């Protein structure tokens, strides 16, 4: 049986390098990852299809520049960061992205994808 410390260390390794976790999953299963935008995404459906759901909550980027071309000034920092990362190619290896539309910004996010 694994200890709590071992489990926490595994979670930390995944959080520190989500790309490696995604690549490892693809090697093990032959299926990739599906990006899920916050919130209200049916993660269970992604799991049932055999894919790894990857939460897309952005990152603590110091500079948002490219995303401003596509998003209105009132877009929240999460959506600006997600769009900036997408424009930089960070999400290129995802098999798909699922968008929900609980806010005005998310309604137009898929237009650039």
Which positions does each model-derived feature cover?
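An N-terminal assembly and electron-transfer interface module characteristic of large anaerobic redox
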Residues: 1-113
């Amino acid at each position: 049986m694994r200890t709590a410390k071992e489990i926490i260390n595994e979670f930390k390794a995944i959080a520190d390098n989500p790309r490696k976790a995604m690549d490892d999953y693809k090697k093990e299963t032959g299926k990739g990852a599906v990006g899920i935008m916050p919130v209200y995404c049916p993660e269970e459906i992604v799991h049932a299809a055999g894919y790894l759901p990857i939460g897309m909550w952005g990152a603590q980027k110091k500079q948002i520049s490219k995303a401003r071309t596509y998003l209105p000034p009132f877009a929240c920092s999460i959506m600006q960061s997600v769009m900036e990362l997408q424009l930089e190619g960070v999400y290129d290896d995802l098999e798909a992205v699922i968008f929900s539309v609980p806010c005005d910004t998310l309604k137009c996010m898929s237009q650039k994808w």
